[in-house]
Amino acid sequence: MTLTEYLKTFIGRPYIWGGNGTGKTAHGFDCSGLVLEGLWAFGLYTGADTTAQGLYDHLTKTATWKEGNVDNAHDGDILFFGKSLSKITHVAVALGDGLMLEAGGGGSACKTAATSTGFVRIRPIRKDVVACVYLKK
C-alpha cells in the first residue's frame, strides 16, 4: 500500500480543526493532521503534531526530502499552500494528474472549515500552491 492509497481510506471523514485522527479528534482531521497520519503510518515523520508551516520547515531541513516542481507534482508529493514559503497555511498530498487529497472545505479559514461541508476529499490542486516536497529515492 502506498501513502496515497492509505490516505484515500480516510475520504469522507469530517474536517475537524486541530484533528489528527486520535483522541478527541479520532473521527476527523485537519489538513496537517491528515498528512501527518500518513507520514507517521509509513515511518516518514517521527515528530510531534504540527502545523502545515511546521511540517514544511521540518521536511525541507531533512536529508530524506527534496523540494520539487509545483507544476509537475507526482503521486505522493506533499503540497504546501499559502502566500509565501514563510506563510504556509495548508498542506495536501498530490495524486498526480493535477489532483490532490486534502482535509478541508467549508470555509476559507481553518477554523471555519469545520462545517458540514468540510471533509477529506480529492480535488484539483489549488492555485496558491507554493511548494512541493517529495521523498528522495
What are these language model-derived features?
Residues 103-123:
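Catalytic alpha/beta core of large soluble enzyme barrels
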Residues 94-98:
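Short acidic-glycine loop/turn motifs at beta-strand connectors
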Residues 63-74:
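Short acidic low-complexity segments
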Residues 116-137:
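Active-site or metal-binding loop neighborhoods of secreted/extracellular toxin and effector enzymes
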Residues 2-3, 66-68, 116-122:
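Intrinsically disordered, low-complexity boundary segments flanking structured domains
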Residues 1-60, 74-75, 82-90, 101-103, ...:
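N-terminal capping segments
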